[in-house]
């Protein structure tokens, strides 16, 4: 089982694909998501988003605020900017 993940900024789709784990920092603290996670919505703070792809590689992105949502093994990360 995998997560369908999309990381987008106002100007581009930064990353899209399947992952086994996603982590990010929200205003409520660090958050980790595995397949089967309950639905949630969070507000991102500036910091790292980590995506572990189904191939075992991990991608790290530095985001500047935004939103994080999980529903039915779909993770959407909408950020103001990515470095």
Can you annotate each of these PLM segments?
Residues 2-83:
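Compact, glycine-rich, soluble single-domain proteins
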